[in-house]
Amino acid sequence: MSDITYQQARKLGLKEVKSRNGRGEDPYLPALEALLPGVNSLSEVDLGSIRIDIDQVAGTRNVGRREAFSASFYPLLEENSEFAAKWSRLAASHLKEGIRDPITAVEYLNRFYVVEGHKRVSVLRFFGAATVRAEVKRLLPPKSEDTEIRVYYEFLDFYKVTHISCIRLTHLGSYPLLLDLLCGEDRTVWDEDRQRSFLSGVYRFRKVYKDSPLGSALTQDGALVRYLQIFGPAALLSRTPGELKTDLAAIVPELNSIKNDSSPVLVTDPAEAPRGIISRLVHPGVKELRAAFLHDKDPETSFWTYAHEQGRVAAQASLEGRVETTGVFRMEDRDFDETIRELRDAGYNMVFTTTSRLLPATLTAAAAYQDVKFLNCSVNVSHPILRCYYPRMYEAKFLTGIIAGAMCDSDVVRYISDYPAYSTLASINAFALGVKTVSPRSRVLLHWSSVTDAKGPMERSGVAAVSGQDSLVRDARRRNLGLFLRLDGKLVHAASSSWRWSTFYRKIFESVLDGSWSDLNSTSEQGQSINYWWGLKAGVVDVQLGDCVPPGTAQLVQLLRRQIADGGFRPFDGPLYDQSGTLRIQTGQVLTPLQILEMDWLVDNVDGEIPSLDRLTPPARELVKIQDAMEDTPET
């Protein structure tokens, strides 16, 4: 009489075969040599004896054993067979003392195929084991541009440091993102203790996630990456299952964002239409507001911080005591969570962090303190539990380009930018198009101030106009900011594209006070992040003209300014070509705000290049990596 355990396992196997046949699917074990005819020619790397996730055991190496098992490794042979007897003895041994002998397998594209030990895998799968010990040889596919192959080689870099193979990600960039989250700049190879600690956190997270209502929303490893983005590795290792459940409940909008593959909602102008009576009843607004501004530096050493502080103070003064604000400086030297807790206990219910360097900490705080409104000064960020903001500077840059092209007495204009972040390339291109509008033969020489090995365009002679850093306040000429021209042998201030933080902060305060802030809450709850990207129309950016600008040029600039603000003129109307001569924007094509924001090319009258990450100074590299990490969407 056959063993009852084998009968139960075989019943599951026969049921799976019937179900798969009904769906027109192969019911038996996948065989790697059938899936990959050239498998014998692949290079091999001996990984030795490692513990692998049993869910990653995808099939068998050779076709000979595949019909003895269903696709999920349940046995299929008759109950009175020698195979069944061996399977039953192995099952009894497992229940008594566990299966100790490792299987032999090959790994291909982070899936494992059994060479020897099929029944051991079958028994372990039936009893719900999580892992199995295996002697593994890795089969390396040739490198190619195929997405799956490229992701796999990113996985190999991840594995080289962690020796963790159970994380399954399929999007380009996901493994480098995960490695950065876990290790930062430290690429020291993990020892067994660190591996065990991390895997313990992973399996605990998977169990909680699987048992939650979100368990079928997206892949568990995609959810894991987003969890690590928000709470960090320390939380994964230390949280109890109950605390993990609470954390997951706090980031439902974040997980919905992944599930829906949501891009940020770019709010390009403040709401101008009067709110309906239903909206006012549902979201009536507040009478008083307390807002804290957190800066990584202080106003004495940072012009950026100084400008935001001026905007904060002016915005508060304009609202006649309805808003109380405070500034907190040098957050780089403070405990972020402790600072937020103290502010919240003091009654502050709105927090602005004024640099993307504080974005990761702001994200963690937004998950922990859901009764506080958080905003970070960055853009194109896909995190719905906070809001982000940044000026639409390319509109003003186009206008300063008009001035440079009209007044420059040579065909060479220099443009100095800081580092390649979102919206930066749109500003460069808009300036170059402004130059080209009035001076078709002029070239714009691009220089990056944050590039360590900068050369090339800056060495060219004949430069008679320089567009430098934007003006954050009104004293542009005194601080040598904006556009300068060499006229009659002297360097003369011609124009500045300026940032009006006081206007932005006042309008955001007003939206909370009148309740219109909450009109966008349902968007966030559905998983879409709110990014304010206001420009000329909102009064958040503007252009200041120097005394040297001729009346005719000034009139042209003011005319175009009004038309851009009203939507009657678009700087990026086609046809537009990039530096290689490729048509990027066709005649009549209207770019969406997101397409403008995510420009990753330069127009054809720009001389220079977009620097790679490794050429940037460490501070600039840090900021770019933070913005990339915060915009990345893990696996759906």
Language-model segment annotations:
Residues 312, 399-442, 526-548:
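An alpha-beta-alpha
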Residues 348-356, 375-377, 463-472, 491, ...:
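Periplasmic-binding protein-like
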Residues 367-390:
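Flexible loop/hinge segments that line or gate small-molecule binding clefts
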Residues 290-310, 315, 326-333, 423-425:
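Extracytoplasmic "Venus flytrap"
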Residues 104, 108-109, 115-178:
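Glycine- and acidic-residue-rich phosphate-binding/metal-coordinating active-site segment common to enzymes
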Residues 389-411, 498-519:
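Hydrophobic alpha-helical segments within soluble ligand-binding/sensing domains
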Residues 515-635:
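Segments of small-molecule ligand-sensing domains
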Residues 1-119, 126, 171-183, 210-273:
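Short, charged/polar connector segments at secondary-structure boundaries
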